[in-house]
């Protein structure tokens, strides 16, 4: 990621005007409540607006980071030396009469809220997602899942803004730079989904999720709401409250990250104001005043301890971003 000092500030200010903000604190926008400031910050209000912003940033070869719910992201204490695009594209539209029934949502829409809206309409299929705090876009990129459900099991099609090649920049007649990119509709097969990953996650920076259509099934509001409450109740009993990023590590094949961390004797371990939860060892809690560095030190301590005891290298489920 380029340094903020290399960003073309005059061009960015001219292009985005008063929409472009500088030195914006990011901690309040993340579920862990840690991290520094965004050097530059702009809010996308719709999928078309998001596409337009990204078009400009790609065309100018400007580094950027898209932030949605901030629930799976650890922002460094020194902040993000790039343009942070805050995704507030949140339109949602249900098709109850369709075959199958479905919901279309822009990528900044809250995934858990959509599951509850579906329940009110007697539409099932997303009950597993009711407790997920992230956005539709993040779910599409990371193949979000819970309670044996995954995004890949619901996705019908997603609209993707695709940058073909980083060397596709070319000069226009006016002298401006223009990138080779286009809007495409991807079926679920194209994403190469596996456990908590996709082609979009494996090749970062080349694709932006604009919207997605998800498969639903007809049921009754009572049945769907009952299933949601069952899942939510289970989450309350097994997952700690407080500021966290959710599951810190992916579960290794045939085992659970939380079990390994607990067996390594790290439940309740604290560094600064950050703690490995005594309730569920795969959750790292900010008790107020923790830094990203505190959490990162716990991550490294955990990885080292689990590898030493079990020979297993835990893979992060969250994404560290920014400067450290």
Model features per residue range: what roles?
Residues 36, 42-47, 74-92, 141-164, ...:
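Structural signature of FAD isoalloxazine-binding scaffolds in flavoprotein oxidoreductases
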């Amino acid at each position: 990621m380029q340094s903020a000092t290399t960003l073309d500030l005059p061009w960015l200010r001219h292009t985005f005007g008063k929409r472009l903000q500088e030195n914006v604190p990011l901690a309040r926008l993340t579920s862990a409540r840690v991290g520094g400031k965004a050097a530059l910050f702009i809010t996308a209000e719709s999928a078309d607006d998001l596409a337009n912003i990204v078009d400009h940033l790609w065309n100018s070869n400007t580094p950027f980071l898209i932030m949605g719910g901030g629930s799976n992201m650890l922002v460094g204490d020194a902040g993000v030396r790039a343009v942070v695009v805050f995704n507030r594209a949140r339109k949602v539209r249900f098709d109850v009469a369709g075959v199958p029934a479905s919901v279309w949502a822009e990528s900044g829409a809250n995934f858990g809220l959509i599951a509850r809206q579906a329940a009110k309409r007697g539409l099932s299929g997303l009950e597993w997602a009711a407790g997920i705090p992230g956005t539709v876009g993040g779910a599409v990129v990371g193949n979000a899942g819970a309670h044996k459900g995954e995004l890949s099991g619901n996705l019908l099609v997603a609209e993707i803004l695709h940058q073909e090649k980083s060397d596709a920049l070319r000069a226009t007649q006016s002298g401006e730079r223009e990138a080779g990119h286009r809007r495409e509709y991807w079926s679920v097969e194209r994403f190469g989904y596996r456990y908590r990953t996709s082609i979009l996650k494996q090749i970062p920076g080349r694709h932006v999720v604009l919207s997605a259509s998800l498969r639903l099934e007809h049921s009754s509001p009572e049945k769907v709401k009952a299933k949601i409450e069952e899942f939510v109740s289970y989450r309350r009993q097994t997952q700690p409250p407080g500021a966290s990023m959710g599951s810190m590590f992916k579960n290794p094949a045939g085992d659970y990250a939380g079990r390994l961390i607990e067996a390594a004797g790290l439940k309740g371990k604290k560094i600064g104001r950050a703690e490995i939860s005594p309730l569920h060892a795969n959750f790292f809690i900010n008790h107020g005043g923790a830094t990203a560095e505190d959490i990162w030190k716990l991550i490294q301590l955990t990885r080292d301890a689990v590898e030493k005891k079990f020979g297993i290298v835990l893979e992060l489920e969250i994404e560290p971003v920014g400067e450290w």
